[in-house]
Amino acid sequence: MASPAQPAATMAAFARMVKGQVRSYSAPVDMAIPASKRKFIPSSGSYPKGFVVSGTHVGVKASNTKFPDLALISSETPCSAAAVFTTNKFQAAPVQVSRDIIKTRQGQGIRSVVINSGCANAVTGKGGLEDAVSMGKKVDECDGLNEPSTLVMSTGVIGQRLPISKILKKVPVAHANLSSTHDAWLTTARAICTTDTFPKLLSRTFTLPSSPGRTYSLAGMTKGAGMIHPNMATLLGVLCTDAPIEPSALQSLLKHSVNRSFNSISVDGDTSTNDTIAILANGAAGGAPISSSSSDDYAAMQDILTSFAQSLSQLVVRDGEGATKFVTVRVQNSPDYESGRLIASTIARSPLVKTALYGKDANWGRILCAIGYTQGVAPGTVVPEHTSVSFKPVDGSPVLNLLVNGEPEQVDEERASVILQEEDLEIVVDLGGGEKGEQGLGGEEAVYWFCDFSHEYVTINGDYRT
């Protein structure tokens, strides 16, 4: 594959702004990255061996006249691949095509992922499926491959056909510009953005127990700011590693990590037609392949991948449409993980909780209400007289108790106001009445991340197609 140097993705290119416009409204446009978000954009990275990427301008949406909206992520050698997809019944064409490719290839021999922003290619019938197939096939042709080896993703407005001729014309350009530089990775992450205010890219190095002297790398990019809720939302993500992992192990590793990361975030409670998180592992760094779930390497990789996916998914919440708060809800002393996750999810989805946090109102009754109406939890999970709720400040100061063992506390409203002025907040729900396991509930903990609802969220989504 060609790997020419890619033009530097400068901050200036991201910092220009259309007058009066805050977000990109389903296709990249001139926009300013909020000062508070610039700290999340990496200035360098540690990227996996054998992977090259590019971001290319197509103009999928007519209003985008110059910014990259076609992303290509490729490995110079065949990869193991795994993916998780949306549970929405109206699954977009690229979701159907990518799912079939992974199934047919049994997670082996995948080389690339191609992604367009600006059009979701969802609810587009037979023609949409043909378009998705043709996108992947064009990449395969550039690689000289005869078998389907490219996963396809799309994001943007639902119900519109892709300008497929424009896209196919630019795929060879994207392929020719493939590069391994940090600027290339950042430009590629920008190419998948829609209403995002900043590109979301992370990378890290790690070691495995079987090869403590060998360094591996893991990189990931994601997009999403609205229509975000688990079981996947307008949320796309691609993870790449040069560690050697067999397909069956890779699928179970990804599922575990996604359940505790991308499936544990919420912006607005809506689940998209296009959600996909995929991971490619090319083994370019060498070492023994991870194949058994009972191995030390598997356990280590599970922790590494889960932690990485959590950090990546949290960037989506921090960029939630109109968000002013990043909220962690921690449910403790649940009889099982899933019951705790359901309670955390219900709190995170509650419009009343989200608007109270935006208004800096310590209205803990709304949190308690959400706990009480949570569906699907194990019997006996929620016992009012054993339940406690508190705010945990990010500055390390003592928690502010709101409810203890079912009894309301005399809340210091002034201190509550100070805590709620901060961008970050943690809500702790203890189902066991205090100390872990005190009520014999098993001590399981589930964590969820969400943001508040503001006036801007309504404005952004009211104007989405304009």
Swiss-Prot record:
The keyword Nucleotidyltransferase does not apply. One of its GO terms (cellular component) is mitochondrial matrix. InterPro entries: Arg_biosynth_ArgJ, ArgJ-like_dom_sf, ArgJ_beta_C. It is an enzyme of class 2 (transferase). Gene3D superfamilies: arginine biosynthesis bifunctional protein suprefamily, ArgJ beta chain, C-terminal domain, L-amino peptidase D-ALA esterase/amidase. Its EC number is 2.3.1.35, 2.3.1.1. Its main location: mitochondrion. This protein may be expected to contain an N-terminal transit peptide but none has been predicted. This is Arginine biosynthesis bifunctional protein ArgJ, mitochondrial.
